[in-house]
Swiss-Prot record:
The gene is gatA. The lineage of its organism: Bacteria, Pseudomonadati, Pseudomonadota, Gammaproteobacteria, Thiotrichales. It is an enzyme of class 6 (ligase). Belongs to the amidase family. GatA subfamily. The active site is at K74, S149, S173. This is Glutamyl-tRNA(Gln) amidotransferase subunit A. It comes from Francisella tularensis subsp. tularensis (strain SCHU S4 / Schu 4). It catalyses: L-glutamyl-tRNA(Gln) + L-glutamine + ATP + H2O = L-glutaminyl-tRNA(Gln) + L-glutamate + ADP + phosphate + H(+). The keyword Nucleotide-binding applies.
Length: 481
């Protein structure tokens, strides 16, 4: 079950050329994205040139699995010669002089870059309402959010603008949008994909991820972008075909841990979807085992102390001098710094910078930042201990279905929507979200988390699940291939 393989067959048979396929997707984006607002920069000329190159490779019989396959990138991956904004006024005119490792790996595989995607500014948000370029709409219901921060990445694939997209995941930023938009998305183990050329939010949490309809497509794409990188010292890489190596194997004997206390207070329809999903895994031969997951509220508090601290340090580079927005009315250096950053950053980014600077202040450092780091270590050890008993841990991907725009503009309310996804980022573990049912006629997602660098177990389990139980009901008509 793979859109990439379906398109590969069409391209190889000559049913359609890469240029024709690219034109189809570009036309759909231009016609339909006005109501969704998922694309910041459409790369029409560049895409058609890349498609022509792909057709030449196909004609010569030298194509790979991804040659000529269209893709959309979250607009925090640097793309040489193309604007990279991170959805911020601060970088509105920034044209990257180099490619990120993620986008370069895609280009090297012959993929066609259709454009750059909307997101929460600097990846800070869970609703995609915090963008300089406006909020993104959920294709399932245009009055609702697509999730965040990779909301554009999820909305674009759900709307059929590309078969696959890249995103980043700092606290659930590919998995929560996937849950809201009926997609499959994965945050791989920390260090398996390079962060070089990826605009930084919180460096010890950030990781590139992928969103698509099918788990097999997600696995194929992660194999394409993963690997060692000489420009990222935290990138340890993974062996070739790490994500796709076990997709055909059944999951009989796999043990899935479930903490019932995380499910009992969910809305009834989501509880039903979770129960049905676990029953289906049992039918596939998996064993369900009761486990105790560390307190998620403590995880949330830890996350929202450490990540703003890292963000405050990372965003200090935007000073109005070296690059980025510069206020034209400043009369001296101090005013230039102050006005450029005040005007260039949105409200949510400024909120997190202020929190970060507060917890890093000498008077607060031990009370907040140090304690949060200690708790992060304790929680990571506790989660890893669970994996001595199980192969994966199952949780919901979000406590609700997609909510309406404006419903969670209160920051704390919005932060709570990350409660199930944050543990994987705190501990650097791989996690995959996939559609499991509906609540109020909107898709909801489940999530599996595994031990570090056991990513292949997750892709295997979800590919087998989707092979037996299908996901057609989660694919909107306009996105079908």
């Amino acid at each position: 079950m793979s859109y990439i393989k379906k398109l590969r067959a069409r391209l190889d048979s000559g049913e359609i050329s890469a240029v024709e396929l690219t034109k189809e997707y570009l036309a759909k984006i231009k016609e339909q994205d006005k109501r969704i607002n998922s694309v910041i920069t459409l790369c029409e000329a560049e895409a058609l040139k890349e498609a022509e190159d792909a057709d030449a490779i196909i004609s010569a019989g030298k194509q790979g699995l991804l040659t000529g396959i269209p893709i959309l990138h979250k607009d925090l991956f640097c793309t040489k010669g193309i604007r990279t904004t991170a959805a911020s006024k601060m970088l509105d005119n920034f044209v990257a002089p180099y490619d990120s490792t993620v986008t370069k790996n895609c280009k090297d595989q012959g993929m066609v870059t259709l454009g750059k995607l909307n997101m929460d500014e600097f990846a800070m948000g869970s609703t995609n309402e915090y963008s300089y370029y406006g909020a993104v709409s959920n294709p399932w219901d245009l009055e609702r959010v697509p999730g965040g921060s990779s909301g554009g990445s999820a909305a674009a694939v759900a709307a059929g603008f590309a078969p696959i997209s890249t995103g980043s995941d700092t606290g659930g930023s590919v998995r929560q949008p996937a849950s809201f938009c009926g997609l499959t998305a994965m945050k791989p183990s920390y260090g398996s994909t390079s962060r070089f050329g990826m605009v930084a939010f919180a460096s010890s949490f950030d990781q590139a991820g992928v969103l698509g309809h099918y788990a097999e497509d997600v696995a194929i794409m992660l194999d394409a972008i993963a690997g060692e990188c000489e420009f990222d010292s935290t990138c340890v890489g993974v062996k070739q075909n790490h994500f796709t190596q076990d997709l055909e194997k059944d999951i009989s004997g796999k043990v899935i841990g479930v903490d019932e206390s995380l499910i009992k207070d969910l809305p009834a329809q989501i509880q039903e979807a979770v129960s049905k999903t676990l029953d289906n895994f049992k039918k596939l031969g998996a064993e369900i085992k009761s486990v105790k997951v560390p307190d998620l509220k403590e995880a949330l508090s830890t996350y929202y102390i450490i990540t703003p601290a890292e963000a405050a340090a990372n965003l200090a580079r935007y000073d109005g001098i070296r690059y980025g927005y510069r206020n034209p009315e400043a009369r001296d250096l101090d005013e230039l710094y102050r006005k450029s950053r005040t005007d260039g950053f949105g409200a949510e980014v400024k909120r997190r910078i202020m929190i970060g600077n507060y917890v890093l202040a000498s008077s607060q450092y031990d009370s907040y930042y140090n304690k949060a780091q200690q708790l992060r270590k304790v929680m990571t050890d506790q989660i890893n201990q669970i994996f001595t008993q199980v192969d994966a841990i199952f949780m919901p991907a979000s406590p609700s279905e997609a909510f309406k725009k404006g419903d969670k503009l209160d920051p704390v309310s919005a932060y709570l929507s990350d409660i199930y996804t944050i543990p994987a980022n705190i501990s650097g573990l791989p996690a995959i979200a996939f559609p499991i049912g509906f609540a109020n006629n909107l898709p909801v997602g489940g999530q599996l988390m595994a031990k570090a660098f056991n990513d292949n177990i997750l892709t295997q389990m979800v590919v087998q699940y989707q092979k037996h139980y299908g996901i057609e009901e989660f694919i909107l008509q306009q996105a079908r291939i």
